[in-house]
Regions:
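Phosphate-binding P-loop
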Residues: 60-68, 104-105
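The catalytic "switch" region of P-loop NTPases
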Residues: 172-174, 181-262
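Post-Walker A helix-loop "phosphate-sensing" segment adjacent to the P-loop in P-loop NTPases
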Residues: 91-102, 135-137
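Hydrophobic positions on the alpha1 helix immediately C-terminal to the Walker A/P-loop
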Residues: 84, 88, 125
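N-terminal pre-Walker A segment at the start of P-loop NTPase domains
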Residues: 37-58
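Mid-core helix/loop region of P-loop NTP-binding domains shared across ATPases and GTPases
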Residues: 11-27, 106-108, 121-128, 136-183, ...
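Conserved lysine of the Walker
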Residues: 81
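C-terminal alpha-helical "lid" subdomain
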Residues: 2-20, 24, 232-233, 238-332
Length: 332
C-alpha cells in the first residue's frame, strides 16, 4: 500500500461483496477468502472525511502562494482511521479515472499514501515519499537532494492531487529530528500542489499540535474525530446499526439474521465500541463457523464469540474486575 503499485492494485481490485440473493453457494475456499477480506462498512467518519476532502481539494485547487488547507484524522487506536483514509484515497483515485478516462491518466498518480517511519528523520521521511513513486535514491544523496530534485519534481510531474500521511503521531517536534521532519512536511505542503490529509492516534494530545511548529500545522488543518461507536446516541443506536451492517454482509449458510444485533450490549463490552475489534471478532467467528461446523451448522453464536481471543486492547477492556474479598475483622 505504501507504493504506487500497491495502492493502484488496492484501488482497482473489486471490493469484497456478499453474493446476490438466489445465486449458487460459493465454495468453502471462496467464502474463507471473502471473510478474510470482508466488506468495508461506510461509517460517519468515512462520510465526514470524504465530504471535507472533496471540498478542500476544490478550495485549494488554484491556491499557489501558501500551503493548501489540510485535514487531520484523530482518535484512539482501532477505531478505523486508516480505513477511512484509504477509502477516501480510493474514492479520489476512482473519481480521477472516471473524469479523465483510463487511457488519459497513464502516468498520472492522483493519490499518494505515506507512513511516517518510527523516529523519522528528514532523510528517512523524504525517502518514504520517494519510495512511494519508486524514485531512485542513491546512498550519498542528501535530504535536500531527495526532496528538491526527486520528490517535489516527480510528485508535481505525476499530478498528485491528494497526499495521505499516516501515523503522524510518530512525529515529535520537541526533538531535533522531529522538529526537522515537521518542517519538511510543511515545506512539502507548500511545494507540492496537493491536498494533505494526516491520520494519527490522539494527535491533539501529542506535541504535534503544540509550540510554534504545532501552531503552524493546527492553523492549516481541520480535525475529523474518529471515535469508538457509542452504544446509544440520543434515540439512535450506532453500534447496533454497525453490527447489523456487518451481519448482513456475512456469507454463512445457516446463520440467522438478527442474531448479532441482539448481542449488541455483549459485543460493545467485548470491543469497547471499536470498529477494528468488532470486525475482527465477526470475521474470525465466521471463519470458525465455516471451518469448525459447530453443531453441524455454519452460524455464529455467543458460544462461538466467547471462544475467540481478541486484540490485547479489547481483552483488557473486557477483562472482568473482581472485588478483593474483605477480611472479617469482627471479634467473636
Amino acid at each position: 500500500m505504501t507504493t504506487w503499485d500497491g495502492f493502484q492494485a488496492f484501488a482497482t481490485t473489486p471490493a469484497a461483496a456478499p453474493p446476490p440473493p438466489g445465486t449458487p453457494h460459493r465454495s468453502l475456499e471462496e467464502r474463507l477468502a471473502y471473510h478474510s477480506r470482508f466488506v468495508t462498512v461506510r461509517t460517519p467518519a468515512i462520510d465526514a472525511l470524504a465530504k471535507n476532502v472533496r471540498t478542500l481539494m476544490i478550495l485549494g485547487r488554484h491556491q499557489t502562494v501558501t500551503a493548501r488547507p489540510s485535514l487531520t484524522v484523530t482518535g484512539p487506536a482501532g477505531v478505523g482511521k486508516t480505513t477511512a483514509l484509504l477509502q477516501v484515497g480510493y474514492a479520489c483515485h476512482l473519481a480521477h479515472t472516471r473524469r479523465h478516462g483510463a487511457a488519459a491518466t497513464v502516468g498520472h498518480v492522483p493519490v499518494a499514501y505515506v507512513l511516517v517511519p518510527p523516529a523519522a528523520s528528514t532523510k528517512t521521511l523524504a525517502a518514504e515519499f520517494a519510495r512511494y513513486l519508486a524514485i531512485p535514491v542513491a546512498a550519498g544523496m542528501s535530504q535536500a537532494q531527495i526532496t528538491n530534485n526527486a520528490v517535489c519534481h516527480t510528485y508535481t510531474a505525476a499530478r498528485v492531487q491528494l497526499v495521505m500521511i499516516d501515523e503522524i503521531h510518530r512525529l515529535n517536534p520537541r526533538t531535533t529530528t522531529g522538529a526537522q521532519s515537521a518542517d519538511l512536511i510543511k515545506d512539502l505542503t507548500e511545494r507540492i500542489g496537493a491536498t494533505f490529509v494526516y491520520a494519527g492516534i490522539d494527535v491533539t494530545t501529542t506535541p504535534l499540535f503544540t509550540g510554534v511548529r504545532g501552531a503552524q500545522l493546527a492553523g492549516h488543518a481541520s480535525l475529523i474525530d474518529c471515535d469508538p461507536f457509542p452504544a446509544r446516541l440520543g434515540n439512535e443506536e450506532p453500534f447496533r446499526d454497525l453490527i447489523t451492517a456487518m451481519e448482513t454482509a456475512l456469507d454463512l449458510r445457516h446463520h440467522k439474521r438478527g442474531t448479532l444485533p441482539k448481542l449488541a450490549p455483549y459485543l460493545h463490552d467485548r470491543t469497547a465500541g471499536r470498529i477494528g475489534s468488532l470486525a475482527r471478532l465477526i470475521r474470525q467467528a465466521a471463519i470458525t463457523a465455516i471451518t469448525a461446523l459447530i453443531d453441524g451448522t455454519e452460524r455464529i453464536t455467543k458460544t462461538t464469540l466467547d471462544a475467540i481471543r481478541l486484540d490485547h486492547l479489547a481483552e483488557q477492556h473486557h477483562r472482568p474486575h473482581t472485588r478483593p474479598r474483605s477480611r472479617n475483622t469482627s471479634t467473636p
